[in-house]
Amino acid sequence: NKRGLPISCFLNEANDSLNGIVDLWTENVWLAARGGGIGSYWGNLRSIGESVGGVGKTSGIVPFIKVMDSLTLAISQGSLRRGSAAVYLPIDHPEIEEFIEIRRPTGGDPNRKALNLHHGILISDSFMRAVEDDDQWDLRSPKDQTVQKTVSARSLWIRLLTARVETGEPYLVFKDRVNNLRPEQQKLAGLEIKTSNLCSEITLPTGTDHHGKERTAVCCLSSVNIEKFYEWENDKNFIPDIMRFLDNVIQDFIDNAPDTMETAAYSAMRERSVGLGAVSYTHLTLPTNHPV
């Protein structure tokens, strides 16, 4: 089957221009067509009502996210494996209040909803301190950092938590903590982590890198069955062999990715990111009555 690819985890971002938005849509269409799970960052875009080209006003991020919602659904319906996507926004973006409610099926304009996308919010340490102190919180233009609106940090936090209780989302990504824990080589290269993926477990740099090239982050994920731990615990090559296999999968993606995934193949080549997790821990502990 030539339709699928060995990688299904991608992270990208939209630039603050019509070309940048259309490029993101186009890339996401091709990723979804191959069954990709996508996490897209929209925090670079100016908010609704900000000036464009000195004469017009931007319509904000929500209409563009709505188009991404429709594109993902349309492409997924024709695929063997459904592609899915998540969208991310920082907590200081001027449209954050509407963004929190974007998956809520009731209330507001149905044309400004994205019910088929998942969504997440990048939380900063300064915002959490403002919540703790019950301070005001400035919502700033991504273009020039001018204050567009000021809200109660605690009220915004309560609104966010209410949405999570009632709808299960948005995801929360504590971006300062994530960036503090970046590998040293990423810090030295000035690579910033702005977003996460469809399931919010991957944190990799996206956008323009220190070489002036665009990155669509790629990660190859797998897991080991901990229930079978005693079958391989003394095999010193077990984990290294798995990691080598995952790196081979990355190479297969690099070798076979189509031109429409050029930025993803470039990112995979530069980073070769892999992740190995574990499943069935409870099944390991229950027979021996060990506490979980």
Residue ranges and their predicted role:
Residues 52-87, 103-108:
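Glycine-rich loop/turn
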Residues 282-288:
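Conserved small/polar residues in nucleotide/adenosyl-binding loops
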Residues 65, 107-120:
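Acidic, His- and aromatic-enriched active-site or binding-groove loops in soluble protein domains
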